[in-house]
Amino acid sequence: MTDYRAFHLTVIGASHIKNGMVCQDFSLSCELPDRRISVVCDGHGGADYFRSDRGSRFAAEAFTECMKDPDLISVLSAAATQKQQSLRIEQLIKSIIARWNELVEQDIKEHSFGEDELSGVSEKARKRYETGQRMQSAYGTTLIGVILTENFWLGLQIGDGRCVAVSKDGEFTQPIPWDEQCFLNVTTSICDENAAKEFRFCFERTLPAAVFIGSDGIDDCFAGDERLYDFYRLTLRSFAQTNDQTAVSQLKDYLPTLSEKGSGDDMSVGIIVNTDFARQKPTVFEKSQQAFQNEVTP
């Protein structure tokens, strides 16, 4: 596993800075001897979701905790059929949701909703929260997470944002099925009552050269998938041409500019990349020569 590295980046959006809003995104990554983990979460924001910045952090923590389960790799590796894979992944999804709800419930217990938080919510949400119903909605967030091991990689998602996988032939794909319920500002959420059924996933035995996961603040900057792929292609070229720390630093330094010129939203990127492959086969990622600033929509 030493040839794969895991990274995560989150920056506050330009519009959030302008309007005095907190960052709603949260991301984590982890490198263990037998696995690499990365996750990005995007809290919904808005008056009814007044604790979604905490919700995104709890979602990232819940995902990471579940991915660290010592038995997880053997359980998923032993799944011989697609049906077995689906059943075990569905159980994993339920565990993530349950852990997120535990973290939310503990936070509510320690920090009850205040009048300053409830004053701006809709009448419908206020009635619900004041009667103790669906209080986790205040923490609503999306989630995209990836785990990569020696034998497989798994991607899980609820809500918007994009997971982009790059094969060792240089092909860019989005292996997690898209949810048509996610459109414009509407998205599914880990706080939904039927969240377990709304999760999508991909399970692959062939390891990629890299996997990128990005909150919708990233993909909303680009006019189509090919422009998004060019952005990640240039990121891979950075890994090929410099050391890991420099590549990540360059990306983090650029994201505020991307937000300002593009979506204005918070931005999170998770990366799991075979850095050895990127440096040994850099020409695989040289399809585009366009600069970042030419890739953002007006």
Identify the meaning behind each predicted range.
Residues 31-34, 148-152, 159, 166-170, ...:
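Short acidic-glycine loop/turn motifs at beta-strand connectors
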Residues 1-68, 161, 192-202, 263-270:
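N-terminal entry segment of metal-dependent catalytic domains or homologous docking segments
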Residues 185-298:
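C-terminal catalytic subdomain
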Residues 77-164, 199-205:
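Catalytic core of PPM/PP2C metal-dependent serine/threonine phosphatase domains
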Residues 38-41, 156-158, 212-214:
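Short hydrophobic beta-strand that contains or immediately precedes a catalytic carboxylate
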